[in-house]
């Protein structure tokens, strides 16, 4: 069989990313390239510095529409503006989101949505007009599907499911939707956004195969979305392995550092990290706790830290990117991911790659592939505090976790994950 050609839809691609989704897209593309699969990667707005050696990058903002666009404005007259909540813009700084929302409302309904030569202009961000961009991106997908040759369609997360559906209808080629997270993870049972849930469900139903990043997510897809089990396949995420353990930096303090790195939202369980920190401080005062990230629970947690008397031992850094993330790992003695519902969780792999002993919640996909991280129930702050204390108090345990964890993540390669995807492609072609 000839090498497969995949038309892939994704909202972001390194080096300009906002979180784990873009990192995963790059890892998958790199792995597919090593396995002989040619990737056409369609993103809303390319910057020109993406890695073109692993995928042909198609900038949706540069695609001249083939369809008649006269009815687009009529369509939007019947769509009420919906403010996108922070749970739908998971990697956008709250201040940036507010600024974009205000700018969008200021510009009003009559701004031009089609530019010269029938090209849509995308921001490629998670801003207040996100739903509008999702719709326009799907229209562009129809043009791309007519213009390029490919064998299979692969759509990453709910933002691109509609694009995948349209590409399938136009081309007749099989569709795979890749579930990196669900609305149940973001909003829980009673706080989910019904519009996003409907988009997710429609995408899963239209797909020929549904790929999930963990068995944890697979069970949610089957039970909460009603997707037949035989249609849903788990392909665990991996990590771009880089030897980072020799890159420790002088941090200027002797205190131990325990780090939470992620969105400060309900899904990520930051309040359990704060409560566990208070318990650890009663047993070991020479510890500092760092919460690196942003989100709607940040201000309440700042107040809670003050109530607990942790103000001088607890630090909020805001959202970190790129080298700042790696520097934070280099400073850390323990990394904690206490997520309430985590589809996978790449950050623990990155921490362990950096030689940081790691604690994760049992309610996570990454718990399925790690043996050398301590696993606790997200709600059990006593167990979490004990785990943090144990790593800090017993150097032998810390060194064991560093060594074994480092070796373990070295085996979780994107090339292996992508080989599973290649096999799925070939089963559908």
What are these regions (language model features)?
Residues 3-4, 40-145:
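A conserved catalytic-core segment of Leloir-type glycosyltransferases
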Residues 211, 252-277, 402:
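Conserved donor-binding/catalytic core segment of Leloir-type glycosyltransferases
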Residues 216, 238:
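Carbohydrate-associated surface elements
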Residues 300-320:
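Nucleotide-activated donor-binding/catalytic signature segment of Leloir-type glycosyltransferases, i.e.
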Residues 340:
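Aromatic "clamp/platform" in nucleotide-sugar-dependent glycosyltransferases that forms part
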Residues 357-360:
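Short hydrophobic beta-strand element within catalytic cores of glycosyltransferases
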Residues 373-382, 390-395:
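Conserved acidic donor-binding segment of nucleotide-sugar-dependent glycosyltransferases
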């Amino acid at each position: 069989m000839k090498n497969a050609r995949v038309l892939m839809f994704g909202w972001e691609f390194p080096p300009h990313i906002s979180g784990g989704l873009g990192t995963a897209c790059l890892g998958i593309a790199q792995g597919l390239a090593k396995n002989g699969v040619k990737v056409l990667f369609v993103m809303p707005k390319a910057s020109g510095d993406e890695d073109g050696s692993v995928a042909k990058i198609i900038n949706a903002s540069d695609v001249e529409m083939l369809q008649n666009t006269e009815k687009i404005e009529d369509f939007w007259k019947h769509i009420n503006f919906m403010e996108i909540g922070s749970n739908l813009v998971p990697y956008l700084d709250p201040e940036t989101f507010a600024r974009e929302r205000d700018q969008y409302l200021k510009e009003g309904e009559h701004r031009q949505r089609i530019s010269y030569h029938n090209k849509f202009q995308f921001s490629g961000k998670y801003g207040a007009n996100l739903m509008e961009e999702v719709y326009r991106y799907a229209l562009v997908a129809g043009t791309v599907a007519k213009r390029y040759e490919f064998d299979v369609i692969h759509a990453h997360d709910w933002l691109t499911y509609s694009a995948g559906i349209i590409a399938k209808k136009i081309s007749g080629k099989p569709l795979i939707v890749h579930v990196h997270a669900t609305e149940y993870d973001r909003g829980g049972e009673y706080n989910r956004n019904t519009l996003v849930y409907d988009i997710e469900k429609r995408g899963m139903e239209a797909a020929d195969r549904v790929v999930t990043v963990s068995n944890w997510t697979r069970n949610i897809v089957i039970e909460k979305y009603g997707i037949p089990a035989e249609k849903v396949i788990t392909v665990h995420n991996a990590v771009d392995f880089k030897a980072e353990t020799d890159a420790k930096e002088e941090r200027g303090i002797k205190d131990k550092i325990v780090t939470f790195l992620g969105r400060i939202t309900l899904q990520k369980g930051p309040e359990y990290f704060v409560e566990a920190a208070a318990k650890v401080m009663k047993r070991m005062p020479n510890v500092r706790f760092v919460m690196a990230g942003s989100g709607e629970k940040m201000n309440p947690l700042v107040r809670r830290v003050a109530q607990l008397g942790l103000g001088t031992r607890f630090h909020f850094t805001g959202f970190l990117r790129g080298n700042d993330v790696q520097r934070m790992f280099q400073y850390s003695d323990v990394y904690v991911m206490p997520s309430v519902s985590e589809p996978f969780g790449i950050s623990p792999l990155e921490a362990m790659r950096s030689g940081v002993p790691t604690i994760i919640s049992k309610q996570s996909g990454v718990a399925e592939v790690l043996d050398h991280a301590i696993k606790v129930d997200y709600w059990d702050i006593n167990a979490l505090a004990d785990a943090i204390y144990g790593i800090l108090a017993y150097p032998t345990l810390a060194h064991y976790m560093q060594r074994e964890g480092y070796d373990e993540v070295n085996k979780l390669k994107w090339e292996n994950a992508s080989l599973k995807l290649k096999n799925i492609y070939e089963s559908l072609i």
